[in-house]
């Protein structure tokens, strides 16, 4: 017979009252990063031949034709900066500068660069949670890890804006035969897609942390406008400009959604999976055509294409918000970082 014995366990150590807030702040930073990754296309200005940029977590990334710079506001109020040379794809491979093709290539490069910028800003924000000996050290994400994150982001985009609308439109067609025609089916599919996009943009704008990202987005636009107007880059000068810019990624995404409706009508395929495969196959083509439209509209404000990009400009009322002077200062610093590298690239003066 086994004798009974009392099992004594040591009392657990009391949890410090500081641990819970630190864990929550760290989790909040990770959630901000994940949300910003999904917003990447809406925050970018993916024009290869002009100055553009992207809002990041508590900062701004700016790019010139041959360089990019990023400035992030640290928790202590100072600004952390970083800059690197940037290779223009169309100079190395001339075919990448062809119309439509250049849009796909430039947007792909913008996604990779945008993700790197977001990682940098997230590292700066998370620096306060690291051990003292590791603070200030930046770890570059490996190529495969970055590829996995970008694949996840693209997969999320395809699932939310391609798969879900197609499922919903198919169910409506089965329930109501009036939606069975080629035109009506794709209109319904497009309306659902745009509705999901608007709901996602509006929903994220309710989160105060992402709203600050939208303020930095506004600071980026104002700074680009001031630069293009050859105005001295000071906070008072920059603040005089608009937060709505025609080359914004928000306008690009809305243009993509509108063009999708018209393009899908031209391909009367049958069967759910055939339609889904068609949407995936046409995505690069539609992105390239939309890029050319945004590019043309930015140069010809009174054209029909400019009119088609108006919905995206209206949507910038959500994705860009009025920045304060400290946020504008970040955007100016980022652009100055990029332009300093631009001037000395390869030891020659590129832009005076």
Predicted stretch roles:
Residues 100, 104, 140, 144, ...:
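Structural motif marking the loop-to-transmembrane transition
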Residues 128-177, 181-207:
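Hydrophobic alpha-helical segments characteristic of transmembrane helices
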Residues 26, 31, 40-52, 56, ...:
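Polar-ligand-bearing catalytic/cofactor-coordination segments
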Residues 67, 95-117, 189-214, 286-299:
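Hydrophobic alpha-helical membrane-embedded segments
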Residues 120-124, 153-178, 256-278, 287, ...:
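Juxtamembrane "helix exit" motif at the C-terminal ends of alpha-helical transmembrane segments
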Residues 2, 12, 18-133:
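Divalent-cation
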Residues 122, 126, 167-179, 206-207, ...:
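Membrane-interface elements of multi-pass transporters and channels
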Residues 114, 121, 161-165, 169, ...:
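Alpha-helical transmembrane segments of polytopic integral membrane proteins
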